[in-house]
């Protein structure tokens, strides 16, 4: 959605990395796309349907268009230093399905915790799959590394919310990364929309679908689902 003013600089850094192959940029608002030659770079594939296809369909699109054994799903307002890509490139993923970002210690669930002077620490999670992952102080939807073989196509019933939960509930070996080299804010794009916007209406529909269908363990009792299950859209 091009809300991050430094995005083109981020892309330049990623293109310079020997550990980054193809970069698939899903343009959900072509009218706001900045003018930059970086989009002509050989590593970048710019995809635009002329409208906002929303978060989870964009993830699925990236999966379809990629050919790497290891995928990075990354929000435009998150910056990942090259050392992280190097770390992931050298990591044995044999017993790893999915890696997300650590939030523990944050004052809220909207900021990635900075761990200064800390080496990268990979922690295996005993995830409570009966609760949404965001409420457990881990961020997967903003930055995650997942094996191609572990990715599952997210149903079109869920277009903004619950994509990370869908993947997590279908993965066995789930980890989180403590690091000072992934920075940014969470949900910055979502909170920019007013309550009557199509985005907010879509969030309500996602929640209603999570209540109605059986894609998630215990989702009928999730606070987010309860909040919107009877709301008009």
Predicted feature descriptions by range:
Residues 2-16:
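Short, well-formed alpha-helical segments that are part of the catalytic scaffolds
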Residues 99-116:
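Short beta-strand-to-loop element that shapes/binds the nucleotide-sugar donor at the catalytic cleft/hinge
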Residues 68-79:
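Short beta-strand-to-loop acidic/aromatic patch adjacent to the donor-nucleotide binding site
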């Amino acid at each position: 959605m091009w809300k991050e003013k430094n995005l083109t600089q981020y892309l330049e850094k990623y293109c310079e990395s020997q550990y980054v192959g193809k970069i698939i940029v899903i343009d959900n608002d072509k009218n706001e796309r900045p003018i930059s030659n970086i989009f002509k770079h050989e590593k970048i594939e710019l995809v635009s349907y002329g409208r906002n296809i929303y978060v989870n369909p964009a993830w699925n699109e990236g999966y379809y268009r990629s050919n790497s054994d290891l995928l990075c799903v990354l929000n435009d307002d998150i910056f990942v230093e090259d050392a992280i890509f190097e770390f992931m490139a050298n990591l044995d993923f044999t017993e790893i399905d999915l890696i997300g970002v650590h939030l523990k210690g944050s004052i809220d669930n909207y900021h990635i915790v900075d761990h200064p002077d800390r080496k990268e620490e990979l922690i295996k999670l005993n995830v409570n799959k009966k609760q949404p992952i965001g409420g457990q102080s881990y961020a997967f939807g903003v930055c995650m590394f997942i094996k191609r073989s572990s990715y599952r196509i997210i149903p079109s019933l869920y277009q903004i919310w619950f994509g990370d939960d869908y993947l997590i509930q279908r993965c066995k070996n789930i980890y989180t990364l403590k690091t000072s080299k992934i920075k940014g804010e969470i949900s910055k794009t979502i909170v920019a929309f007013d309550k009557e916007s199509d985005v907010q209406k879509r969030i309500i529909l996602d929640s209603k679908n999570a209540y109605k269908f059986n894609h998630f363990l215990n989702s009928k009792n999730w606070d987010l689902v309860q909040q919107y299950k009877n709301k008009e859209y």
